[in-house]
């Protein structure tokens, strides 16, 4: 069954609140800080670059100089180097996560909790 709208109780478009959903009002400043810290993005880009460059360069450096044309051993070396880079990334990520947890335990409150929105 349909209900009737009472037009006298409805607000016009100009009378409605400036807030639409979760967006801030026009008079408030929005928080534009990135969700991920810049140091995390830099580490990710560095390890991405290393994941591309190190295995390929290790293959081409070892195929002729170390293994004398045997591409199987050179490919295995490249795979091992890719795993070394991956393990290095995991170790760095775990160390960063542990340092964040220690900061929270000490009462630091994390990296971004000390800041207040203006």
UniProtKB/Swiss-Prot annotation:
Short motif (Prevents secretion from ER): ranges: 115-118
Keywords associated with the record: Cytoplasmic vesicle, Endoplasmic reticulum, Membrane, Transmembrane, Transmembrane helix
Pfam families: VMA21
Cellular component terms per the entry's GO annotation: endoplasmic reticulum membrane; endoplasmic reticulum-Golgi intermediate compartment membrane; ER to Golgi transport vesicle membrane
Chain ranges on the Cytoplasmic side, renumbered to this chain: 1-35, 95-118
Lumenal face of the membrane: 57-73
Domain of life: Eukaryota
TM ranges: 36-56, 74-94
InterPro entries assigned to the protein according to its UniProt record, in alphabetical order: Vma21
Assigned protein family: Belongs to the VMA21 family.
Protein name stated in the entry: Vacuolar ATPase assembly integral membrane protein vma-21
Source organism of the structure: Neurospora crassa (strain ATCC 24698 / 74-OR23-1A / CBS 708.71 / DSM 1257 / FGSC 987)
Lineage of producing organism: Eukaryota, Fungi, Dikarya, Ascomycota, Pezizomycotina
Encoding gene (name): vma-21
């Amino acid at each position: 069954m349909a209900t009737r709208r009472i037009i006298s109780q409805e607000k016009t478009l100009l009378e409605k609140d400036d807030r639409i959903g979760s967006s801030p009002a026009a008079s408030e400043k929005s928080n534009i800080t990135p969700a991920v810290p810049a140091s995390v993005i830099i580490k990710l880009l560095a390890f991405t670059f290393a994941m591309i460059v190190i295995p390929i360069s290790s293959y081409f450096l070892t195929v002729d100089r170390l293994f004398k044309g045997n591409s199987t051993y050179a490919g295995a070396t490249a795979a091992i180097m890719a795993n070394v880079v991956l393990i290095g990334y995991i170790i760095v990520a775990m160390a960063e996560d542990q340092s964040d947890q220690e900061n929270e335990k000490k009462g630091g409150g994390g990296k971004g909790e000390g800041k207040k929105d203006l």
